[in-house]
């Protein structure tokens, strides 16, 4: 068989969720390009419509289908692939490939597993097998033993005495408590943790046996407190191996690496220790027979010997979150090389695209420091304990590059956009030590700064945190620089990594200091190139980071300063309310500009995304998204304009201060598209309400209040219940439905702390209304409606958490015509140039406008996949000066139904409330498409792992006609207890305790009447044909909406 004739199946990772985020969109998109470069025909299957990799042009055939064996088997039947690459779709891709092999599907259709063999995957995921292989190799591993279910046992009916006896034996085998319990074949440390007492360990093992695909839990000796390191290794079929980089966690062992601040290259490991672990990493990857990228985790401690002591903790035989970080940190494209190695290419045969002179066989060398910090959703879940452990809770991460660790750390913290919201003045020294230093949490880095400002010593902080002294000395340097600023020394903190505006604010504590004064004396910010070789070869790829520390003079930026160029601001780290959808929009904007002959430069700091790939744009600037730093990029590139519409709230929020900063510097550069003031008008409820009133556009009664009394007065006028929320937020943060004065008073005084600078919005709650989302593009005159979506959930559930269907099912032509009319009026009233999202509600035949956002929305990718209309690309082109008429753009109404369903993180956040409401909680989404709306909904539930088995036992507490006929409905006194005993397999209820039990037991559930009615329709269609069809082949009518 020749290479050109091969058809390769690439399995994606599915929806964004905690433990598996956008890194697999990046790696999958890179792999698609790499395989096609080698002449392979690529078939891609993924369930996530928000990704670049599911664009129809990314592969020869793109299927948006559930990532589960039956759906993949149907695609295999249709496409007849020669091979499948499992290691590029995360844990989801590995698990489904293993299932297809076990079911005989791969053998039946002669599909080879390419790259890393399945036996190797089993050897790394099965902890006993892994321990034995390491022992054979002579590599030290933590003492461990496996607790497994017997042949006739299940996790719900295992004898309690037998379980306790096995746990007791396991504790004795590894040397006593504390221990680490790890669940096999799971994601992001799910079901894992450090356990200090026996009863907690029994509970953890019971949970782990239920979560594990092969019903096993590994109990290991605790190496908490050791240094955690990761080595990214690459190997080809010819046994050539290289180390891409090593990464060091600042947080000690006991905290998941996805939760830790991570630094590369390693700063504290002695060279002898590094060489020992480097040699071990190569020996391990060779012993296991891994081909392609691989991540090996070590624990290390200083035992007084030159090299210290290490343990091999685990191996990920696939591309991972750390692989994405390593790729962006070094410029070495791990996913691209992995894909080519899977085809049989040797490392020396694969070009290094950054240098253009070397190959993938050359190990990267870096002359800078990279720091990654996670981003947690603790603002969305105040009821959840965010103490960090071996199980992930973070949704995303930010990365920064600097010449020193201090500079890199400050840039990373700035990029994370995290506000600890701690009033340190109210925290005593004892509380600081016990609650913020000893207890690992998202606030801990900031607590370390605070401790040093109070005079804590390095030894004090080391005792409380376990952070190594080398790092603490650098934290202390940052704290000292902050103190120096207040005494008039502005050069030191600026050189260390503070922005001019931050230095001015610090210095103003000792007097009035202007940003111009700081800029005049602070070191200039210059741009350096990421080249994979520490300057040994000239780099041809424009991938940059800024530095302003000593020795950072001279800029490496090689932009054509005479060319028409634009800076596009990305979305930063993934968080709830601002997910990979905005990176999709950013990448489409880049592609649109490049198609138009305009240089496109991206400013972003998320290592997981396609927008931060080195060859996506004409210039990649890995920087925090602040007005000052974006303006520096504008100066370096001589850009004509900046686009802030595509990166979500992060990029929109920087628009006004950036406009002021550009004007302050006298730069001839504009914010392109919709005017910044129009964006503000749409977010300012009073101004927006007046705009709608002037045009006789219906809206819920209400307004904004700047005091408790004002809020109570508004609620009295509108009538309870009312919807309350702060202004200028994304994802419904702090939004609630309140029913009386007491609830409103509590909300205003405690939840948002209303003030004249922070008004609260009080609106009539439209109960039982049908909510709609509209995405549109305007060129300032004409308006193209990209799609109209009908929410499946009733009013009161945030649009980002509601399933929705396109085209709408229950709207008459008159309603659609009014929706179009209202959308067009708003677009023109706001002088919209670019994207516009309008959220509406229909009640008793009246169309009400809830809000409008003249920027990208989270539904843009879904609409584009459903209709085939590339609305983000169209928006970028009209922002660059083209008209919709010039572009010959047209609308399209799909013949099939597409349902977007959300994925919720409750299983990863113990203590969270699983009930849906006006505050957004979902992390990602899936899509189901079929000619029958019921089947589309059912496919979406399968993709979201929330599809019940018809005929299974169910508790139905919500009144939904006909749903119970599909199940064996049981009536129990204590529903949560029955669920935990395994007596309930599907739950229909809005009771928090019952829903929490369903989440813990991982059984399907619905919590609203609307979702239950949709599920009834889905189950009725479940036995029908799945209709797997490539995205590009889905039929669309050349019609207009309304």
From Swiss-Prot:
Name the record gives this protein: Carbamoyl phosphate synthase large chain
Q: Entry's InterPro entries?
A: ATP-grasp (IPR011761), CarbamoylP_synth_lsu (IPR006275), CarbamoylP_synth_lsu_oligo (IPR005480), CarbamoylP_synth_lsu_oligo_sf (IPR036897), CbamoylP_synth_lsu-like_ATP-bd (IPR005479), CbamoylP_synth_lsu_CPSase_dom (IPR005483), MGS-like_dom (IPR011607), PreATP-grasp_dom_sf (IPR016185)
- Pathway of this protein? Amino-acid biosynthesis; L-arginine biosynthesis; carbamoyl phosphate from bicarbonate: step 1/1; Pyrimidine metabolism; UMP biosynthesis via de novo pathway; (S)-dihydroorotate from bicarbonate: step 1/3
Question: Which positions are annotated as binding Mn(2+) 1?
Answer: 297, 314
Metal-binding keyword on record: yes
Residues covered by region (Oligomerization domain): 418-558
Q: Which UniProt keywords apply?
A: Amino-acid biosynthesis, Arginine biosynthesis, ATP-binding, Ligase, Magnesium, Manganese, Metal-binding, Nucleotide-binding, Pyrimidine biosynthesis, Repeat
Query: Where along the chain is Mg(2+) 2 bound?
Result: 314, 316
- Residues binding Mg(2+) 1: 297, 314
Gene for this protein? Answer: carB
**Which cofactors does it use?**
Mg(2+); Mn(2+)
What catalytic reaction does the record list? hydrogencarbonate + L-glutamine + 2 ATP + H2O = carbamoyl phosphate + L-glutamate + 2 ADP + phosphate + 2 H(+)
Annotated MGS-like domain ranges read 947-1042
The UniProt family comment states: Belongs to the CarB family.
Which annotated residues bind Mn(2+) 4?
851, 853
Residues reported to bind ATP 1: 127, 182, 188-189, 221, 223, 228, 254-256, 297, 314
